[in-house]
Amino acid sequence: MKTSILILAAGLGTRMKSQKPKVLQELCQKSMILHILKKAFALSDDVSVVLSHQKERVEKEILEHFPKTQILEQDLQNYPGTAGALRGFEPKNERVLILCGDMPLVEQTSLEALLGNNAKLNLAVFKARDSKSYGRVVIKDDGVEKIVEFKDANAREREINTCNAGVYVIDSRLLKELLPLIDNNNAAKEYYLTDIVKLAKEKDVMIKAVFVDEDEFMGINDKFELSIAENFMQEKIKKYWMQQGVIFHLPQSTFIGVDVKFVGECEVYENVRIGGKSKIINSIIKSSSVIENSIVENSDVGPLAHLRPNCELKNTHIGNFVECKNANLNAVKAGHLSYLGDCEIDSGTNIGCGTITCNYDGVKKYKTIIGKNVFVGSDTQFIAPVKIEDEVIIAAGSTVSVNVEKGALFINRTGHKIIKNYYYKKFQK
């Protein structure tokens, strides 16, 4: 049976206390709504999102990554609430999966289990450790009797710890029949989607409760819950990669972006941050290093190194306090305290301490190209654009602003001068 998916993302998100819409808050370097959409499109080709607050901003983010998403707009002024969000929604398939845009931890396998039940109305529920302000689910004879919103629950109903996760699977025809019957006769004067349970019961529809994991189905409403959710996601990411053979030393101290990939035998030490679409292949990343959108193959990086975006390292050693950006390094050694930006450096080359590629003139950036088996002495500056051919020696303390031919020695120090007894003349009273 084919399924249409509707994601509710029209809320104001005031508890997040941010100018950024709630569903655009990031977990592991990806917006909440994008986490949900990835799982939704894995299950269906008919996916819609309901927006309202900062609609244009959220819509732009969604369509940039998932251009086939259908965007709907909720009239919050006249039809507030979760049922109000469904006005104008026309599913293409026989049933509808309704999700919340602030549930980025939900796994595809859990949604598949929910869809595996053939009841006309299924809802995800969980046993809450702390029921807080969740809607309470009253279950009787293996079926759902009703859902009571916290604001409308009496003292006895508030003692129930079976709570509504806010995720539903409903027959499309049943939804079309019952949705117009939902009113706003409640404390909040909102149109509650939960009322569809009561209406379905009145028509003797069997309603099935599917128990799910509370942590996985948590809704994120503020920055504290955002941090909790990101910790959960980090644990999942690192657990997955450890099961694939990656070694993490003190994994709780490292941050791995959701789009990062590891290949082969890799080792990651404490306090490392790897983000973007970085790919680490058979490499060691040592303590307190940062890697952003870069490829590292058969190399070791760090400690205390920084690979900014668009670096590609192969068979290379990058030591402490070395920063690279937009750098292609093949079998290179850069042991310490250097900046290598907008450059290509070939095999066998050694970069001395304090080397800088001066790539920016205040308007435009330029490239430094260094060939094979070049020895670069300490405290060297390359004034780009500049090309150093193979088997060149650059003397320590050089400022290189011209191309250097193969096999040459480059040196441009000024002559030295020694003034005897100068110290005593300057400081003697």
From Swiss-Prot:
Q: Which family does it belong to?
A: In the N-terminal section; belongs to the N-acetylglucosamine-1-phosphate uridyltransferase family.
Q: Which residues catalyse the reaction? A: H336 (proton acceptor)
Pathway listed: Nucleotide-sugar biosynthesis; UDP-N-acetyl-alpha-D-glucosamine biosynthesis; N-acetyl-alpha-D-glucosamine 1-phosphate from alpha-D-glucosamine 6-phosphate (route II): step 2/2; Nucleotide-sugar biosynthesis; UDP-N-acetyl-alpha-D-glucosamine biosynthesis; UDP-N-acetyl-alpha-D-glucosamine from N-acetyl-alpha-D-glucosamine 1-phosphate: step 1/1; Bacterial outer membrane biogenesis; LPS lipid A biosynthesis
EC number annotated for this UniProt entry: 2.7.7.23, 2.3.1.157
Q: Which organism is it from?
A: Campylobacter jejuni subsp. doylei (strain ATCC BAA-1458 / RM4099 / 269.97)
Residue sites binding acetyl-CoA per the record = N359, Y360, S378, A396, R413
Protein name, entry field: Bifunctional protein GlmU
Primary gene name = glmU
Record flagged with keyword Acyltransferase: yes
Which residues are noted in the entry as Mg(2+)-binding? D102, N221
Q: Which InterPro entries match?
A: Bifunctional_GlmU (IPR005882), GlmU-like (IPR050065), Hexapep (IPR001451), MobA-like_NTP_Trfase (IPR025877), Nucleotide-diphossugar_trans (IPR029044), Trimer_LpxA-like_sf (IPR011004)
Listed GO CC annotations: cytoplasm; membrane
Where is region (N-acetyltransferase) located?
245-429
Record text on cofactor binding: Binds 1 Mg(2+) ion per subunit.
**Principal subcellular localisation of the protein:** cytoplasm
Which residues does UDP-N-acetyl-alpha-D-glucosamine bind?
8-11, 22, 74, 81-82, 135, 149, 164, 221, 308, 325, 339, 350
A GO molecular function annotation here is:
magnesium ion binding
